[in-house]
A protein has these predicted regions:
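Small-residue helix-packing and pore-constriction motifs in hydrophobic alpha-helices
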Residues: 1-46, 55-66, 76-87, 97-146, ...
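Structural motif
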Residues: 50, 89-96
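ATP-dependent adenylate-handling ligase core
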Residues: 69
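Hydrophobic, low-dielectric interface segments
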Residues: 162-198
């Protein structure tokens, strides 16, 4: 069953490894604690995997700091991506893929090529939010991506500007069984991980 010993051990291991990456991406123990809490809140609100959200934060934090963004900005972008994926109806696998591609784009400082295509295919709502936030037509984004014009300093504020709208849209949607299950898994992983650290 779901609570078999092997599963418990793998959840505890996943919690440890995700949080180790989160610690490395944080500038202090206070920032780590607050980021961990906000990421869990985002995960539970959107029914997305804590591991995926923490990975997006951990992978993009360093590069976003180089552009002068704070941990709070990284958390807002993470929430915009997660919420956009849920509104888009992305599967867990698709969401994981988009999160990986998007964090790679942020690490490089530009969203283009394969990374843009991945977000465009599975994250329709993210792309529409990006277009709205940048004040351009959605159809123009592909050409901008090809020209290397979707730089982090444009993409990040554009997505953050749409967060309120994304939150409202998501709040109006009925909850799915899969997001309920993900919420239980997130909470259980935190509990197992916490018990394991005690």
């Amino acid at each position: 069953g779901a609570f078999a010993t092997g599963h418990l051990i793998s959840l505890a291991d996943e919690w440890s490894s995700v949080n180790a990456r989160l610690k490395q991406a944080s500038q202090s123990s206070d920032e780590f604690a607050s980021s961990q809490k906000v990421l869990m809140d985002i995960s539970q609100r959107t029914g997305t995997a804590f591991s995926d959200n923490a990975a997006l934060f951990a992978r993009s934090a360093a590069s976003m700091r180089e552009y002068g963004y704070s941990a709070d900005d990284v958390l807002k972008v993470t929430e915009a991506i997660s919420t956009g994926l849920k509104i888009s109806g992305a599967s867990t696998a698709e969401a994981g893929s988009v999160i990986t591609q998007f964090s790679q784009a942020l690490a490089q400082g530009v969203l283009r090529g394969e990374e843009f295509n991945s977000v465009n295919e599975s994250g329709d709502r993210i792309v529409r939010a990006l277009a709205a936030g940048m004040g351009v037509a959605r159809k123009d984004l592909k050409a901008m991506a090809d020209d290397g014009k979707l730089t982090a300093d444009k993409v990040v504020p554009a997505l953050i500007s749409q967060l309120g709208i994304l939150r409202d849209e998501y709040a109006a949607m009925p909850e799915t069984v899969s997001s309920s299950i993900t919420k239980v898994e997130n909470a259980f992983m935190a509990w197992v991980g916490g018990a394991n650290e005690a």
